[in-house]
UniProtKB/Swiss-Prot annotation:
Site (Cleavage): A111, G112
The enzyme's E.C. designation: 3.4.21.88
Subunit structure: Homodimer.
Protein name, as recorded: LexA repressor
Functional description taken from the UniProt entry: Represses a number of genes involved in the response to DNA damage (SOS response), including recA and lexA. In the presence of single-stranded DNA, RecA interacts with LexA causing an autocatalytic cleavage which disrupts the DNA-binding part of LexA, leading to derepression of the SOS regulon and eventually DNA repair.
Pfam families: LexA_DNA_bind (PF01726), Peptidase_S24 (PF00717)
InterPro entries attached to this UniProt entry: LexA, LexA-like, LexA/Signal_pep-like_sf, LexA_DNA-bd_dom, LexA_repressor, Peptidase_S24_LexA, Peptidase_S24_S26A/B/C, WH-like_DNA-bd_sf
DNA-binding region (UniProt annotation): 28-48
Catalysed reaction, written as an equation: Hydrolysis of Ala-|-Gly bond in repressor LexA
Keywords (A to Z) from UniProt: Autocatalytic cleavage, DNA damage, DNA repair, DNA replication, DNA-binding, Hydrolase, Repressor, SOS response, Transcription, Transcription regulation
Lineage of source species: Bacteria, Pseudomonadati, Myxococcota, Myxococcia, Myxococcales
Entry annotation: catalytic residues: S147 (for autocatalytic cleavage activity), K184 (for autocatalytic cleavage activity)
Amino acid sequence: MEGLTDRQLEVLRFIASQIEDHGYPPTIREIGEALDIRSTNGVNDHLKALERKGYLSRDPVKSRALIPTSAAREALGGGGEAGSNVVPLVRGPARPGSRMIEIPIVGRVAAGMPILAQERVEDTVQVDAFLLGTNKKVYGLRVQGDSMIGDGILPGDYVFVKKQLNADDGEIVVAMIDDEATVKRVYFEGDRVRFQPSNPRMAPIYVRHSDFRSTMILGVVVGVYRKLT
């Protein structure tokens, strides 16, 4: 594995710390501001180097898709057993002293025709804190339906949700609409709010701002887990 410069290590450490603290990676602009890198091109140069050297996995079309690999975990002092595309998940209580955090699984949520989410804890799972951070407001929901397949969220997946009552434009949220829970991207458009599926065969849900009190954002999706067997 090719070594890192001091600056590259600094960038990698900042990305990892943001995931640890907030449950999601920083944007390119946030990296530049935090580390006094004046241009986005400068940040991108460091990110490309980290990716080329095998320390970072990234999606060029998504600003927050910066995932440290197992090699990065080793470089930063963590374990390296899991692949960069795997969310470690174990049922039952977390072992004392481990880096695993316990996530409650709360009912089910529709990613298609909305169904009522059962607001009760059905199970708990363990997830590596390096991937989701240590935020205690994260919970899991099981997805039904295929309206979010364009974002890689498939029927039977678990979405990990950071509990909050607001969201930024374009984020994937769990929302309660007319007492029904659903997973969609949210867009604020003038006098209405659009909840957009990523399956092109499905239509968006529109809610007028005047009716928004009957629509509650339950949280922002910060991760997805899929069983492979």
